[in-house]
């Protein structure tokens, strides 16, 4: 027995070197698994953000419609004139009936 004894780390390294293609494939499979997990995470994050943006768009659309309705009702001058003349019996004064009041 003149053969030197090999230590366990040397044996493991020797086996790994002999089967380097299997080691390379194992590392590729592991990196692929990490990439799939990362891609899934990013996809879920973007989907959540997309849903929030859609909700914000819907909220802003409803607000815009309400503002348009409010603008239409506020700018309807004939409505104000009709209410003043019909319900309140008001009429536009003649220029001779106008009185200018000056505040000191």
Swiss-Prot record:
All ranges on the Periplasmic side of the membrane: 44-104
Q: How does it assemble?
A: Part of a complex composed of FtsB, FtsL and FtsQ.
Q: Give the matching Pfam families.
A: FtsL
Organism, by scientific name, is: Shewanella oneidensis (strain ATCC 700550 / JCM 31522 / CIP 106686 / LMG 19005 / NCIMB 14063 / MR-1)
Q: What is this protein called?
A: Cell division protein FtsL
Q: What is its main location?
A: membrane
Gene transcribed to yield this protein? ftsL
Biological process, per Gene Ontology: FtsZ-dependent cytokinesis
Q: Which InterPro entries match?
A: Cell_div_FtsL
């Amino acid at each position: 027995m003149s053969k030197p004894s090999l230590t366990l780390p040397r044996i493991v390294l020797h086996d790994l070197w002999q089967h380097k293609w299997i080691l390379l494939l194992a590392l590729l499979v592991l990196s692929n698994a990490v990439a799939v997990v990362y891609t899934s995470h990013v996809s879920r994050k973007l989907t959540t953000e997309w849903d929030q943006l859609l909700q914000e768009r819907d909220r802003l659309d409803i607000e815009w419609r309400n503002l348009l309705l409010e603008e239409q009702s506020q700018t309807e001058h004939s409505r104000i004139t009709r209410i003043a003349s019909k319900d309140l019996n008001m009429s536009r004064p003649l220029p001779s009936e106008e009185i200018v009041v000056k505040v000191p």
